[in-house]
Structure formats: structure tokens, C-alpha cells
Amino acid sequence: MARKALIIKQQRPQKFSTRYYNRCKICGRPRAYLRKFGVCRLCFRKLAHNGEIPGVKKASW
């Protein structure tokens, strides 16, 4: 899990626009962020398996 200090630091307004980065809305993870859903890959997988993301289903081909 992300450290609380880093999450709070990222939420404050940044002096320069290039300092902004995306974090997962659930766990605060900065990597493997899925922009369309606003969560990281781990939380996305958990939500998709529970059926909490509408229109998402496991791929099979």
C-alpha cells in the first residue's frame, strides 16, 4: 500500500503541471494505473471479478 504521506502530498496543488501523476482511487498505488477506470490493475481485477464494474467481463478467445 502507498504511504499516507505520499498520497496527501500528491493531493495538494502542485507548483508545476508536470508534477501531477495519477493514483488509484482505492489503494493509492501510483503504478499500473488504468485511466479509463481510475484504479490500478490490482483493484481493477478485484472489482471485475466481483462484477462491480459494469460492462467488464473476462476475455476468452
Swiss-Prot record:
Cofactor: record remark: Binds 1 zinc ion per subunit.
Entry GO terms, CC: cytoplasm; small ribosomal subunit
GO biological process, alphabetically ordered: translation
One MF term in the entry's GO annotations: rRNA binding
Binding-site residues, Zn(2+): C24, C27, C40, C43
The keyword Thylakoid is assigned to this record: no
InterPro entries assigned: Ribosomal_uS14, Ribosomal_uS14_bact, Ribosomal_uS14_CS, Ribosomal_uS14_sf
Keywords attached to this entry: Metal-binding, Ribonucleoprotein, Ribosomal protein, RNA-binding, rRNA-binding, Zinc
Cofactor (UniProt): Zn(2+)
Transmembrane segments: none
Protein purpose: Binds 16S rRNA, required for the assembly of 30S particles and may also be responsible for determining the conformation of the 16S rRNA at the A site.
Entries under NCBIfam families matching the protein: PRK08061.1
Subunit composition and interactions: Part of the 30S ribosomal subunit. Contacts proteins S3 and S10.
PANTHER family hit by this protein: 30S RIBOSOMAL PROTEIN S14, SMALL RIBOSOMAL SUBUNIT PROTEIN US14M
Similarity-based family: Belongs to the universal ribosomal protein uS14 family. Zinc-binding uS14 subfamily.
Name used for this protein in its record: Small ribosomal subunit protein uS14
Native species: Caldicellulosiruptor saccharolyticus (strain ATCC 43494 / DSM 8903 / Tp8T 6331)
